[in-house]
Regions:
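Conserved alpha/beta core of the MobA/IspD/sugar-nucleotide pyrophosphorylase nucleotidyltransferase superfamily
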Residues: 2-11, 173-260
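Conserved beta-loop-beta/alpha segment of the NTase-like Rossmann-fold superfamily
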Residues: 79-154
């Protein structure tokens, strides 16, 4: 029944990449440390996770890992809730390898999220309260999808059929938000699929959503629609402007609510 599941104790944040498409902004610092309304992206993410009851967060680092580790130490100290694992292959592989680096953490229910997705607690609550399925893919809709969107096709019951950037326009029902929840046998299925994918050279340059696509073909992935304007993905400089507007508004809204 929706809302009856406890939040998973674990979350994995994929923050190994540099973020080349942001140009000089990420020449010397990783994308996840870029400030939004005066607060680094990764801090927004972790604070939202902790506030929702998730008490173990693993951050996969790569580019300028020492800067991420320093920030996490300064902000969260040694309370045991936050840990990092280093992906030494970050510059020559894609995020499927970062998932493989963190596979030991995937021993029970966990959230997997991209290190460039900002989101509100309301989004997490919606996903965590969704009906239990092996894999829950958070999705959103918009009038027009661009070439960089990770597009999603659904069946009539909300099961994911396909996840791909190259879906034809007539097959697109939503886009992936970049946050996936694994429950029941989902963690084992995903971990086994990682091991299998990396037996082949093409797995080194693959996205983890290619595994979600494979699991979807077995009707194991259900979509969860998230609230509108509750998230933002940071890929290009224009996204930073959008994120600043969205999250400065949210901060103001929360401040006004607290004062009432």
């Amino acid at each position: 029944m929706a809302g009856s599941e406890k939040p998973p104790v674990k979350a994995i944040i994929l923050s190994a990449g540099q973020g080349h498409r942001l140009g000089p902004l990420t020449t010397s610092i990783p994308k996840c440390l870029l400030p939004i309304s005066g607060k680094p992206i990764i801090e927004w993410q972790i604070d939202a996770l902790l506030s929702t009851g998730i008490n173990q967060v693993t951050v996969v680092t790569g580019f300028q890992s020492c800067l991420i580790e320093t920030l996490l130490q300064q902000r969260y100290g040694d309370d045991g809730r936050i840990e990092t694992v280093f992906n030494p292959f970050f510059s020559i592989t894609d995020n499927l390898v970062s998932c493989w680096i963190a596979r030991a953490v995937m021993d029970r229910d966990f959230l997997l999220l991209n290190g460039d997705t900002l989101f509100e607690e309301i989004l997490l609550a919606r996903v965590l309260g969704s009906d239990p399925t092996p894999v829950t893919l958070s999705v959103d809709q918009k009038p027009v999808y661009d070439a960089d969107d990770m597009k999603v096709q659904l069946d009539e019951n909300g099961w994911v059929r396909h996840v791909s950037k190259t879906l034809p326009a007539g097959q697109i029902d939503a886009e992936s938000v970049g946050l996936v929840l694994f429950r029941e046998r989902g963690p084992l299925l995903f971990r086994d699929a990682l091991e299998e994918a990396l037996r082949h050279q093409k797995g080194l340059k693959a996205w983890y959503l290619s595994i979600i696509e494979n699991l979807a073909s077995r009707q194991l992935v259900k979509a969860c629609f998230v609230p509108e304007s509750s998230w933002c993905e940071i890929d290009f400089p224009a996204d930073l402007i959008k994120a600043e507007e969205l999250f400065s508004e949210k901060k103001l809204s929360r401040s006004v609510t607290m004062q009432r």
